[in-house]
Structure formats: structure tokens, C-alpha cells
């Protein structure tokens, strides 16, 4: 009882009882759009398709304005989970035949699916009939857009895929698509630099927050020493590691060893050649390297454990030491390693170690802008305007997605339940697609189908695939992650503390930072002063240290699906209060809105040399899994085993080319 009273009192202090801007409802209708789908006790599907009226057609339907739990929102995964568990068809009933026939059906409305529709039309005819199905209440897949209006001012954030970048140069096909929809990255980057506003937070530093649960005491340490690569953080006025560490609650042994690790130039494998060193480093984790070769005290590990979360969704216990060398983590400065990549490196690390032409840009809503511009190209009435710049503040009209007579149509809240050839795959002229939408089942037919959904679902919806291909599709386990955005009424606490963000290696979210201004077109997000509202970004990648990488991801899936929004909100408020409290931050007063973009199935699984085999060319699971099957081909980032937008586009191009080669166009 006493514990419950303490919990209730703490909740009041955090503001759990305070109203925040919550838009889980539009026009009195609860979202997500699939909330009534099959599941425990929800009853059977119906089959009445006559005069159907769907959520996306209603006036005011606008998912980017929703807050609360987003990403894979409730209702978006019911059908998929029922198919996985083998109980969907028990209550599904007989699908209603829409009598619709298309040239192409695309399952999955993310960037890969939209690109597949674009490439198909370009390869065939401007009047090609295409239907795109997606299980979420918004298009874009992981490339989602979040909108906030603190104080009545429009602020935009990405709810998933963040930027136009890749470890390797974009292919001609991916680059050509970008240019065709109006994205000229060098020009956009130059315009953003001319627009300025990036000096808004000039003079402010990063900070570290050490939490008592992990490090023995709550302590905010402003500034970060060192500099250099992605793994090191920013500089802090020439402060040495030894000086900075004295401000932390870390033990004397940990402080001594971290300073040694960061500053010393030691060859920890002096008897090995360059190639032998790289091979050895590829077969041990960075944690093992620190403990067994650098000989750090075990109390050092928590300081570095979560540093690889943002790239891999797992900690340094499950990421190879050679990967961390590629990202300039400490400990390798004296090992005299040549700068070349090796075959025993992940896709991302291999790219980071390979010189290439830089290609990088971040829209305010991340790659949701790529999806929106693709939608403009496919269905012009969806997004007004003519340029990438004017698209940022343009409001999408979702009622235009599925118009009678339009050559290209998109149906949201529509989960594919079965995809199979009408007849034998080798000789069939059509493919039948059954999908669930708002507690009804429908069928359509097409000359060809591109499955641009997640690989692990394909064996459940396309049961006729060969067993070896199904096994390959099941191999990759998508990386769970959370992108949380918090709208604050002001950033006075940040200003008072002299910081832009806080690294929190031991907390529920591993950091928080104010969103940098991203001026483009008419959009201006830079606050005039500390009294103006800002957006703060947080990330979480649940995992279970000690297990192999794929098992850690599975544990993370379960964690995210079982965690209610209230748990996220409580942890967010607690983290803000503890990290920024000394600057006067009051979570009950200063938080305006919270959006948690929950992605239990987030990044495409990238092969990890520490855990995965060295497959021969053409024999990796993604290559075996993406083989065409009759009039069905596969496009998604899983098919490349690389979580990058250009890879998703390249796989779409390949999938459409395979349809053409099979004469399915």
C-alpha cells in the first residue's frame, strides 16, 4: 500500500495526471484503422463489400496529426499476428470478390512499395492499373511523418526513417528516382545552409546523465571530452578525459581505465599481421575486446554498452570489435590497421570504411517526404504543389488515395492475408490477393504482385512458396526500435544548463536532444528564443544482452508489443525530470505532447559477422528469399539485408524488372 501511494505521488509530480495534447481520435473515431480486426474474442470477418465506406475517405482524416502511440499502432498487426499464430482462417469467413482486376498489386505502401509502383508504371504505361495495400493508417511504411502544434505553431518530425543517406553511393536507379520526384540533394543542402538558423543553439554543449540504477548516483555532467568519430561525442573546450571523468559517479578504476582506453595508443595484438588482426577483431565482440585485450575493469562496460544501439539495436556485447573500429570507437589508435574494409564486416561498417561520394540530407519529417513526393507522382491529387520544397508544408488529402476510375489506388488499413496464383505458378495468368480491411475480407486479382511487405510475413501470406525460400525469408529478424518525439512548451531548462541534449547510456531511452532547425521552403522550425516551443528526440532499442543478436531482437519485439503507452510516458517524464531538473524543468508544466513511434519490427536485419555465416555469393538468406515466384516478386529493404532507403528503392527496381523478365507485365 505504501509503495502504491509513493508511486501515485511520484506520478503526480511527473504530471501523469496532467492533460497533454493527445490526438488518438479524429472525428470521434478511435485509431488505428484496423482496431476491429480479427483477434482474441473479436469475432469473425464479414464479407459485405457493397457501398463500403472506409476511414481514409472520411473528412478530416489526417494521421500525421495523431500523437500517443504511433509507428506500428494498435490495429495494424492483428491480422498478421493471427496468420502467424495459425488461427486467422478459423473465423475469417469467405472473402467478398470485388471483381477488381489490376495490372499490378503492391503489398506494402512503404518507400519500396511506392517505388515499385513508380517503376512499374514507368516501364509499362501511364494508364497502368495499380493497387497498393498497406496495413497501417498512413502511407510510407517506416517513413512516417509526425506533426505537432505547440502554441499553435507547426513543428514536424520524422516518425521513422530519418535521412537520405547510405554507407555506399546511391545506384543510378535510386538516384534517378530521387531526381524524378524532385529531390536534388546537393541543391537542397545548399539552400538549407543559405537559410541559416543553425546557430540557434550555438555555444550549447552535449551532456551525459548518469542514472543511479546503473551508475550508483544521478548526476548530470555537462560537456563531453575528446571528439572524433561517431562513437566519441563532441568536444568540450579542450577538457581531457581524466578531468571530465572526475565529475562522474564512476569508480576510480573505471575512470582510470576509460581515460587509458580513450587516450592511449597501444597495439593490443602486437604479434598479428594487419589481416590477422582484422579477422580476429571480426570474431570477438567489442565488449570482449575491452575486457580481454584492453583489460579494462568490468565497471567500464556500462559506459559503452548502449553506444551501438542506434546502429544495430544491440549493445557492444553482440557487435564485433571490427565494426566498432570502422566507427572510430576508442582502443584501435595504436593497432596500425590499414583503412580498408574487409569481407567480414557488416554492410554499414563496410560502407563507412569505404571512401565514397557523400550523399546526405534530412527533411524535417525524414524520409516521409520521399514517400509523400512519390505519392504526388503516383496520385497527383494527394499532395498539392510542384517541388520538394513546397511539399514540406503541404497537407496531404487522404480522400484522394482510392478514387473510382483512378489508375493508381491505395488502401490503408488493408492487410494482405493470402496471395496465390490462379492455377499453377508456372502457367498462371493472374494472382489472387485476399486482404482484410475494417473487419471485412476482400479479393482482387492482378497480372502481377510485388510483395513489398516485411520478409517474415511473406511465408504466411504466400503459402505456395518453396520450403527453402520460406526458410530464407524467416531468417532475418527485424530490429526493434522506438523513435519518441516530445513537444516542449519552451527550452529554458536547456538554455540554463547550456546544453542541446543529454546522453543517458543507462536509461529507458538512451538519450534526448533538441531537434536541429531544418529550414526548407516555407517551413521554419528555429525558435526565436528559449521561451518558444521545441521538439526533443529520444530513442530506445530494447534488447537482451548476452543472447545472440537475432534472439535479442525477438526479446525486443515482445518488450515493445507488451508495453503500454503509460509506461513510455512515465519513463519519459521521469527521464526529463531527472536529467533536466537542475535547469528548472518541470515535466508536469513543460511537456505539451508526446508521440511514441513504436517499431517492434524496425530496421531490416543486417548480417552480423559475429553471429551469421559467411555465405557464398547468391546464397545469403536475403538473396534466396527474394527469388521471383511465378507472377510474384519481392521488394523491401529486408531483401537487401540493409536498412537504407536506397536499398529499398533498388529492390523495388529489381522486383519490377523480374516481373518484366517473367512476362508478367
Regions found by a protein language model. Name each.
Residues 256-414, 425:
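Active-site/ligand-binding neighborhood in enzyme catalytic cores
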Residues 412-547:
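Mid-domain catalytic core of redox enzymes
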Residues 70, 74-78, 84, 89-279:
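N-terminal glycine-rich phosphate/pyrophosphate-binding loop and immediately adjacent elements
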Residues 103-118, 133-136, 416, 448-455, ...:
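Conserved beta-strand->loop/alpha-helix structural units within folded catalytic cores of enzymes
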Residues 1-20, 47-50:
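N-terminal secretory signal peptides
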Residues 17-18, 24-48:
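N-terminal export signals
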Residues 56-93, 147, 212-214, 218, ...:
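Conserved flavin/dinucleotide-binding core of flavoenzymes
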Amino acid at each position: 500500500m505504501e509503495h502504491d501511494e509513493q508511486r501515485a505521488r511520484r506520478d503526480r509530480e511527473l504530471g501523469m495526471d496532467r492533460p497533454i495534447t493527445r490526438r488518438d481520435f479524429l472525428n470521434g473515431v478511435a485509431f488505428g484503422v484496423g482496431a476491429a480486426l480479427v483477434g482474441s474474442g473479436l469475432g469473425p470477418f464479414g464479407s459485405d463489400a457493397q457501398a463500403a465506406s472506409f476511414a481514409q475517405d472520411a473528412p478530416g482524416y489526417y494521421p500525421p496529426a495523431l500523437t500517443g502511440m504511433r509507428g506500428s499502432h494498435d490495429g495494424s498487426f492483428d491480422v498478421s499476428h493471427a496468420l502467424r499464430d495459425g488461427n486467422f482462417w478459423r473465423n475469417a469467413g469467405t472473402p467478398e470478390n470485388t471483381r477488381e482486376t489490376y495490372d499490378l498489386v503492391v503489398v506494402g505502401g512503404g518507400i519500396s512499395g511506392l517505388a515499385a509502383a513508380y517503376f512499374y508504371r514507368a516501364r509499362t504505361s501511364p494508364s497502368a492499373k495499380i493497387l497498393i495495400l498497406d496495413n497501417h493508417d498512413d502511407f510510407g511504411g517506416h517513413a512516417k511523418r509526425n506533426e505537432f502544434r505547440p502554441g499553435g505553431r507547426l513543428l514536424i518530425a520524422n516518425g521513422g526513417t530519418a535521412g537520405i543517406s547510405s554507407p555506399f553511393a546511391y545506384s543510378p536507379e535510386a538516384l534517378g528516382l530521387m531526381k524524378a520526384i524532385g529531390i536534388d540533394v546537393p541543391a537542397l543542402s545548399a539552400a538549407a545552409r543559405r537559410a541559416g538558423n543553425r546557430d540557434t543553439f550555438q555555444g550549447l554543449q552535449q551532456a551525459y546523465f548518469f542514472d543511479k540504477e546503473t551508475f550508483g548516483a544521478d548526476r548530470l555532467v555537462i560537456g563531453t571530452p575528446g571528439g572524433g568519430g561517431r562513437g566519441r561525442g563532441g568536444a568540450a573546450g579542450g577538457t581531457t578525459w581524466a578531468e571530465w571523468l572526475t565529475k562522474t559517479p564512476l569508480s576510480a578504476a573505471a575512470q582510470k581505465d576509460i581515460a587509458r582506453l580513450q587516450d592511449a595508443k597501444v597495439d593490443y595484438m602486437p604479434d598479428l599481421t594487419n589481416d590477422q588482426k582484422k579477422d580476429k577483431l571480426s570474431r570477438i565482440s567489442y565488449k570482449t575486446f575491452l575486457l580481454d585485450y584492453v583489460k579494462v575493469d568490468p565497471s567500464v562496460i556500462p559506459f559503452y554498452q548502449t553506444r551501438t544501439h542506434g546502429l544495430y539495436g544491440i549493445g557492444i556485447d553482440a557487435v564485433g570489435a571490427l565494426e566498432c573500429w570502422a566507427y572510430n570507437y576508442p582502443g584501435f589508435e595504436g593497432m596500425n590497421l590499414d583503412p580498408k574494409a574487409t569481407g567480414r564486416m557488416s554492410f554499414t561498417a563496410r560502407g563507412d570504411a569505404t571512401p565514397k561520394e557523400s550523399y546526405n540530407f534530412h527533411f524535417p519529417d525524414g524520409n516521409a517526404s520521399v514517400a509523400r513526393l512519390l505519392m504526388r507522382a503516383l496520385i497527383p491529387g494527394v499532395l498539392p504543389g510542384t517541388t520538394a520544397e513546397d511539399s514540406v508544408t503541404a497537407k496531404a488529402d487522404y480522400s484522394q488515395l482510392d478514387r473510382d476510375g483512378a489508375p493508381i489506388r491505395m488502401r490503408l488499413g488493408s492487410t494482405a492475408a493470402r496471395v496465390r496464383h490462379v492455377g499453377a505458378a508456372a502457367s498462371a495468368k493472374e494472382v489472387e490477393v485476399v486482404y482484410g480491411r475494417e473487419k471485412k475480407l476482400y479479393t482482387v486479382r492482378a497480372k502481377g504482385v510485388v510483395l513489398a511487405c516485411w520478409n517474415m510475413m511473406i511465408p504466411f501470406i504466400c503459402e505456395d512458396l518453396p520450403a527453402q525460400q520460406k526458410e530464407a525469408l524467416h531468417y532475418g529478424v527485424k530490429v526493434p526500435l522506438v523513435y519518441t518525439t516530445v513537444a516542449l512548451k519552451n527550452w529554458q531548462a536547456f538554455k540554463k544548463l547550456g546544453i542541446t541534449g543529454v546522453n543517458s547510456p543507462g536509461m529507458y531511452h538512451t538519450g534526448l536532444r533538441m531537434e536541429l532547425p531544418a529550414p526548407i521552403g516555407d517551413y521554419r522550425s528555429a525558435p526565436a528564443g528559449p521561451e518558444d516551443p521545441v521538439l526533443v528526440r529520444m530513442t530506445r532499442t530494447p534488447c537482451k544482452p548476452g543472447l545472440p543478436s537475432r534472439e535479442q531482437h525477438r526479446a525486443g519485439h515482445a518488450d515493445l508489443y507488451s508495453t503500454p503507452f503509460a509506461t513510455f510516458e512515465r519513463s519519459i517524464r521521469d527521464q526529463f525530470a531527472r536529467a533536466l531538473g537542475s535547469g528548472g524543468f518541470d515535466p508536469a508544466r513543460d511537456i505539451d505532447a508526446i508521440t511514441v513511434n513504436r517499431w517492434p519490427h524496425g530496421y531490416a536485419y543486417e548480417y552480423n559477422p559475429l553471429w551469421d555465416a559467411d555465405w557464398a555469393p547468391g546464397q545469403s538468406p536475403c538473396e534466396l528469399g527474394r527469388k521471383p515466384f511465378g507472377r510474384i516478386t519481392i521488394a523491401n529493404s529486408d531483401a537487401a539485408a540493409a536498412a537504407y532507403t536506397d536499398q529499398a528503392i533498388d529492390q523495388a527496381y529489381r522486383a519490377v524488372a523480374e516481373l518484366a523478365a517473367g512476362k508478367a507485365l
